[in-house]
């Protein structure tokens, strides 16, 4: 029943309103159908239909107050109405512009959602929702905000007296309106910035914008600046707004100087120390050149050719002074001369063999035992077998005696006689070193001047061949390598001497190479054993013990094997060294590389040094 009553009331209202609206439409059509001359002129908007006595009085008073006004000029009410209409139109235009911009942003974000990746669509939809319900900003603001001092003249009635500007506005209201206007402007600026960032980001993602968006660039620059401020220990958050550009530059320079200046001071100190060390080395070299080594005694030169003075040396009273600055050139010339002599010796040997084979006058006089003995000497299998046995025995003893148990101190060595050494040291010195020595000595000989070309044709007249070439101890190979590489100059360099004097690490942080360690070891063995005239076997044993202690036996022997200037002139072509390059022996010795040894090095001269110290 209630529903029927409501429907009945609504129908009554519609029937009541319908004819009335219809009458108004008919009146408008009739007015539009009249010609323009017969249309009724409408009163201005806001004007009173009938002017009362108060209005006439006000008009007369206004005319009296404005004597210069023309009689046909529009009234103040009309002017105010036109101004209000213009203001409303501007407001509507600005609102329409803001609404259109808002719709354009919504369309732009919708396009981003459609073109975006599936993983990003949910986030873009949430951002679109927030933006759509945020509202559109008013571009020009309200009319009252645009002219805060103009007053609200639109509400003035035509019959009332116009109020003076600012009469109804206090200072507080003006300030409030200004603050409101500023807030609106800030919101507008913030929204425009956001829209600009979104547009740059979209253009950059689409590829139509080459550079990064300004927001991304500013963010990265801010990160860099924050890190620099943190590293430089600067506090600019408090007074950065009150400082000028020059003052900021000075503060940054001061902060950078606090970090850079200590580094520069250290670099200058290092350069000064390097200069002082270089000057000291030059001074030591100058003193060595001035003083020189003691003159050689005996009245003869220790050159290969007796009675001849080497290149770069000077004869003074039967003695030979050391070479001067041309020492390196003299050594190069000497090396070239030795190479030439070696080639000449080989050529002479080939010519001699050719002559003897062609003449054939002394072939019957060659003893057969000589060839048999030579063929027997060329076999090195038993030497390799002996080396393998000695390596295995040393390895077994080394594994049995752990490094912490096998430490021979000086106190224990003083109580030991030469025959009372431990078993591992004995095996290393008497078996392993001997096996290495014999294998290195296979086919090793000392280079000689050879037979003269004049004596070659007379070889057939000799009853037998000349004696075999002079043998050479393997230790002499290490000594020749030491001299060829200028080992004494390296070990006794001023820099190493200064480092030893000040207890500084000789090589610093750099690793010691096998070549440097070998030169140092040979120099140590020579300086300890030569004053006591020890044999080459003793010196080789000391070197092998030192190599085992430093785990460099394979690398040191390999350096000798790879030295062509030593191998070619001192080894026969059939020797084990020239035939195999000592490869299998190095493989056997490598079994000891992972073991740690602490063998005595100066065992052969320890008692002699103790006797010397006692006296």
Curated annotation (Swiss-Prot):
Keywords: Coiled coil, Phosphoprotein
Example of a GO biological process term: in utero embryonic development
Pfam families attached to this UniProt entry: RUN (PF02759)
Domain of life: Eukaryota
Acidic residues bias (residue ranges): 24-33
Region (Disordered): 15-41, 147-180
Skewed-composition ranges (Basic and acidic residues): 158-180
Ranges for domain RUN: 423-604
Coiled-coil parts of chain: 76-102, 163-238
Phosphoserine sites (modified residues): 73, 499
Described purpose of this protein according to its UniProt entry: May play a role as p53/TP53 inhibitor and thus may have oncogenic activity.
Protein name: RUN domain-containing protein 1
Organism: Mus musculus
Lineage of producing organism: Eukaryota, Metazoa, Chordata, Craniata, Vertebrata
